[in-house]
Every structure is written in structure tokens, then in C-alpha cells.
Amino acid sequence: MTKVEYKHTEIAVKKQLGQNFLTDRNITRKIVRLSGAKPEENILEIGPGFGALTKEIIEVCPSFTVVEKDPKLAAFIRTEYPQLNVIEADFLKIDLEAVTGARKLRILGNIPYSITSPILFRLLEYRRCFMHATLMMQHEVAMRIVAVPSTKEYGILAVQLQAFFDVSYGFRVGRKVFKPQPGVDSAVITITPKEHVPLSDPEGFSRFVRCAFHQRRKTLLNNLKESYNLDAVPSEVLKRRAEALAIQELFELFKEMKPKMLS
């Protein structure tokens, strides 16, 4: 069992929580600069751990909210930074609307590898609650988020997020700046909810994307024919694969889709 100790607080690292603690202050400063955080803003940090990033955010914004699932780490943050609002809970289960209040959130976090995708889809669900997020995650996942069409990384994650967010790759973070050291590098990305998305049915679009990419080597015709009436779609379009279509092309294709009624 790996144990990490900081300021007389020792915890057994929980692999199921994906706990890897950042140790390089140059990286945390860079994350806060990239976030654009300002003193008057409503800031939320996901998973502060031992407060490496927290310490730098405080330099900009003396009081803000953190969400920490681990009881021992939540207690540590309360003691170390009594001015902060500590929510001891699973980020995937909290009501972000209640946390937001009257002001949209600016979110920062070194998010656990094990729940990166669930956190991203949670942010997608609550996209009206925040103005910007700066997140560190596994490098491979970051590359999938910012991927472009006709690349192996381009898939459901890229399309779902890029449809509703402006996404940007910040910088790579080597594995040696974490304790315990993970087996892969990390990266920092930013996501900003788009002001306007040309979709009247976002949930329907999400279902369509999952169908279109269900088997990525198959054509749109083969992936969609069981779930949608394709009569209005040109045959040359149906011969293509979903991975070759840009976001706007997928928007336009979705508008032509008519879901089949279940018998």
C-alpha cells in the first residue's frame, strides 16, 4: 500500500479514487495563470488533495469552494485553509446549480484519472453553471478531447465536448512531478461553454453521436440504419464514417435524422 504524508497528515493512497498528488509549484502556478482566475470570481476546485493547487488559487482568490471526497483530505484542507468552503462529497453527486448560486463558476482541478470521463460528462450536463474550466488529466484523454476529424483520437468524447465547448490544449505535465508517480504523463486543457449551440435537442444529438460512432470502422449507413430513418440523407454521405465528419457536418446530418419509432 502506498502512503503519502504531508504536514503530519498521512493517507493511504486510494487507487480507486485515482489519487496522484502534484508536487511541483511551477506547474500549479502555470495552471492558475492559464485559468485566468480573478479575485471577485466564484471559483470551485475539484479534488484539492493536499492543497498544492489550492495554495496557488488562494494567491489570487482568498476565499472559494473546494470539493473533496476523501474525509481525511477534506479535514486537512479545513484545518490548513479555514477560510475556504469545503464540500466533503463526491463531485459526481453534488448539485452544481446549488453551488453556483447567482454567479457562474470558474472551475480548476487536477482530476482523478479513474473518473476523468464521468467528470467531463458531468460538466457537460451542468454546462450552464460555469464559465470556464482548467483541468489536468491523463495526457491520452486530453488528446482525445482536442482531436480533429480523421485521426484515431477523434471519437465520441471529442464530438460530445467540442459540440458544446470551446476546448484548448494547454501544456503537457511529466509524470515525475506527482506522488505517487503515475505510469503516464498528464496534460492541462481548458474548456469554455459555447454561448450558442445550433441544436434544439442536445440529448437527441448525444444519442445520435453514440450511434454514429458505435463501431468506428463501419459506415454511417451501417451504424445508423437500425435506429434512424435515413431516406433524407444523400447516399454519398452515408458511405462515410463518422470519424471523418467535422462537428458542423454532424450537426447538419443530425438535423436530417428521423428516429425510428420503437414497436
Swiss-Prot record:
Keyword annotations of the record: Cytoplasm, Methyltransferase, RNA-binding, rRNA processing, S-adenosyl-L-methionine, Transferase
Cellular location(s): Cytoplasm
One GO MF term attached to the UniProt entry: 16S rRNA (adenine(1518)-N(6)/adenine(1519)-N(6))-dimethyltransferase activity
HAMAP family: 16SrRNA_methyltr_A
The species this protein was found in: Chlorobium limicola (strain DSM 245 / NBRC 103803 / 6330)
Keyword Transmembrane carried by entry: no
Keyword hit for Methyltransferase: yes
Top EC class, one word: transferase
EC code: 2.1.1.182
Family from the record: Belongs to the class I-like SAM-binding methyltransferase superfamily. rRNA adenine N(6)-methyltransferase family. RsmA subfamily.
SMART domains for this protein: rADc
A Pfam family matched in the record: RrnaAD
Function: Specifically dimethylates two adjacent adenosines (A1518 and A1519) in the loop of a conserved hairpin near the 3'-end of 16S rRNA in the 30S particle. May play a critical role in biogenesis of 30S subunits.
Disulfide bonding pattern of the chain: none
Coiled coil, from the record: none
Protein's name according to its UniProt entry: Ribosomal RNA small subunit methyltransferase A
One Gene Ontology cellular component annotation held by this UniProt entry: cytosol
Binding site for S-adenosyl-L-methionine: N20, L22, G47, E68, D90, N110
Reaction equations catalysed: adenosine(1518)/adenosine(1519) in 16S rRNA + 4 S-adenosyl-L-methionine = N(6)-dimethyladenosine(1518)/N(6)-dimethyladenosine(1519) in 16S rRNA + 4 S-adenosyl-L-homocysteine + 4 H(+)
